[in-house]
Amino acid sequence: MFERILVAVDGSTNSDRAVEAAAEMARTHGSTLSICHAFHIPEQYKTDLADELEEALESDAEKILTHAAGVAERAGVTARTVLLKKGHPTEAVIAYADELGVDLIVVGVRGKTPGQTRAMGSVSGAVTEQAGCSVLLVRGR
């Protein structure tokens, strides 16, 4: 049913739960699993410090993706990871899902990214409304 699954992560505990759920589904159904993390630097923050800010965000993002891949690996699934840096996270996740031709996007609800609160809540809601495929929302325990 779901041959290609994409899970969007933000480094939160709920994000880990989303990876666990996606990995379990992928393992059970023999699906491919991709994990993405998206960040965007708004124009008003593109100043002389933009390069340093982007480097810091990229470093954090790589740690988030490495951790998420480890969560999937512990669930018995090897996942492909990708960092999305262009556009708003919602748009980036949906565009990447379309590019991959995924059947299911999995997101945690009410996650957070550094410097933001409840970011994944807004992203998960927007992905649910705008995605061209099924979306699974995973709540924390």
What residues fall within each predicted segment?
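Short, well-ordered secondary-structure micro-motifs
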Residues: 18, 45-48, 91-94, 117-118
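Solvent-exposed polar/charged
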Residues: 24-27, 98-99, 129
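Short, hinge-like loop/turn segments at secondary-structure boundaries
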Residues: 51-54, 98-100, 123-124
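Glycine-rich, Arg-bearing micro-motifs that act as flexible, cationic patches
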Residues: 104-130
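A short acidic, glycine-rich active-site loop
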Residues: 52-63
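Short secondary-structure boundary segments
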Residues: 37, 108-110, 139-140
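Small/aliphatic-rich secondary-structure junction motif
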Residues: 3-48, 71, 75-80
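Structural beta-alpha unit
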Residues: 70-105
